[in-house]
Amino acid sequence: MKALKGLLVLLIITGLLWYVYEEDYHNSGMAGVWGEVKQDAQNIRNSEPVQASITFISNSMAFMTDFLSGSSSEEYEAPSIPSPDLAEPNNQSFSVHNIEITDSIEDVEEVVGELPARVIQNEYETEWHIYHQQYQNFFMVAYDDNDQVFGLYTNQDLLRSNEGISIEATKSEVRAVYGDPIDFIQKGNIRYQVNNDQEYDTFKLDNNYVTFFYDLHQNEQITAVQIISKEMEHRKQGFFGEKSDELVEGLAYQLFDLTNATRAKFELPLLDWHQPAQTTVRQHSLDMAENNYFSHTNLAGLSPFDRLARDDVSYKMAGENIATGQPSSVYAHHGLMNSEGHRQNILNSDFRLMTVGVAVRQDGQPFYTENYITQ
């Protein structure tokens, strides 16, 4: 079987080379072909626009290696973890994992029955308590100073409402129930515009700001919901959070967790945190933030793959996502999921490792860099 696979690969490569260099062979023989190959290799090395092609070749070789060895990501089986029994909310319009805004921390502990998998700083000068079982049944809870819930998030089928809206509803169904989304959030004398574009809608319900995120690649179906109480929202003085080392770390780990929670939804292998590449991505985010640019290629002309090589990070295949302008990792992640190229990295079944680097400008604007790696 391996011999047959090897022969098939050889035939494919031979066919491609013949297609590209047939004319050179007829004109100059093998010497002409070899000279043309060397010249093409030099052109590729010096050509910036072909970096995407180099990436594709790297990914293709990784796939070919798996093909020849008989290994495949199709062998992955998602763990079977039961979903909780969900009921309609009692006091609010929505519940997440049977938890509602204003519930006590004791209520949450009784419902969940376990400690959070991670606790991180968020942009509201409080913390997200992140719960999941191997990234299934994923949700986040934030508490006020009295240990009452005043923030919730989930991207999985844990949402229930009094109006029959669940994670399977579409944008048109949401708007049919709740009307037009709000255009701004007012804090004191300042109005902050809410960018209700195709990707998400924000409504003010029960004195909470409820944001539905939509998947543009799945018929604008709800892909996540975030519920922030008015009190929690007003803790954030501006559009972005207050810059701090704790926030930078929290945003990075949150983006990692959101990515794995999304891969769990699509029954893809979960990613491990790759510490060796963390300096690489953090430095790129810091470079973009300090020098006010946004690009995969830095000001020194180094591509993502050049930077990995510079930092002695080995890989068989690698990819990079970058984002900025969003107020949090939640908005950044869902924006990336609605961008075809970035979505392909997030949902690539062959990646096994991930790291995230975040840098925040003085005005609070975060810059995100994600690296996906298989070694």
What are these regions (language model features)?
Residues 35, 106, 110, 172, ...:
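Solvent-exposed, polar/charged alpha-helical surfaces in well-ordered, non-transmembrane soluble domains
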Residues 198-200, 205-273:
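Intrinsically disordered, low-complexity
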